[in-house]
Amino acid sequence: MQQFEWIHGAWLGLAIVLEIAANVLLKFSDGFRRKCYGILSLAAVLAAFSALSQAVKGIDLSVAYALWGGFGIAATLAAGWVLFGQRLNPKGWVGVILLLAGMVMIKFA
């Protein structure tokens, strides 16, 4: 395992924020009917992967990708709830709990 440096954690945090922004912008694009939002979504995805590429210089890929994906899913879920009124059913909540438990296990592995 590589030694953690805060700059790589910051890059990972930026990658997570950009992924969430990309997902929200994609929803706003309405299936790319609103092209400006669609293009911004693609730009955010590109920027997210660029930030993730910087993060993995100092964080193991398996850990960085799991945290990026997990936090991205959880935060996108929250954004969908707040911005679009989307709700999960009980099975969905079980999935979120399993996702969070898996992220914790990977972090401590």
Curated annotation (Swiss-Prot):
Any one GO MF annotation of this record: antiporter activity
One CC-aspect GO term: plasma membrane
Protein name stated in the entry: Spermidine export protein MdtI
Primary role: Catalyzes the excretion of spermidine.
Subcellular location: Cell inner membrane
Coiled coil residues, start to end: none
Keyword Transmembrane: yes
Lineage of source species: Bacteria, Pseudomonadati, Pseudomonadota, Gammaproteobacteria, Enterobacterales
Cited Gene3D superfamilies: 1.10.3730.20
NCBIfam families: PRK10650.1
UniProt organism field: Salmonella paratyphi A (strain ATCC 9150 / SARB42)
